[in-house]
Amino acid sequence: VELGKKLINEKNAKVLLFGGPEEDELKLSISQMIKPEHSFLIKTEKFLQSIAIMKRCNVFVTNDSALMHVASALGLKVIALIGPTNPHYIHPWKTEHKIVSLNLDCAPCFFYSPKPLTCSRTDVQFKCIKELEVDMVWNNIFQKGGFPWIG
């Protein structure tokens, strides 16, 4: 939400909210918390329709998901928010990308298996993703060492 607000307020960006039908309520909630006139809920019947819309994005901010890999395959510039997975194993491939991660000593702790994701931390559960800050993502996009193709 905070990243969306900052992109809209400071860069006049349009924010597209992707996800499956099970995430429609979440996408609507996010859209309402940022500026609805600058955010768009992507609801498609077919995965290929979502991909066609993704191709129009200037940059794709995502977690480690199928859409991250699709964005990479499309040659999009990708900002990947990585928490419990291994960024050396799952990173966007053959495209310009930045990895935003806390690089905690307990990560990676998720190794693609049928077991559900659990967190062994006692201080903050899933700290690796919950404590990623907007400025970390913003700086990877716009500041020194960020992408020269986004202004």
Stretches found by the model and what they are:
Residues 33, 40-41, 72-149:
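Nucleotide-sugar donor-binding patch of glycosyltransferase catalytic domains
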Residues 1-83:
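Donor-binding and catalytic core of enzymes assembling or modifying cell-surface/extracellular glycoconjugates
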Residues 8, 24, 143, 149-150:
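Intrinsically disordered, low-complexity, compositionally biased regions/tails
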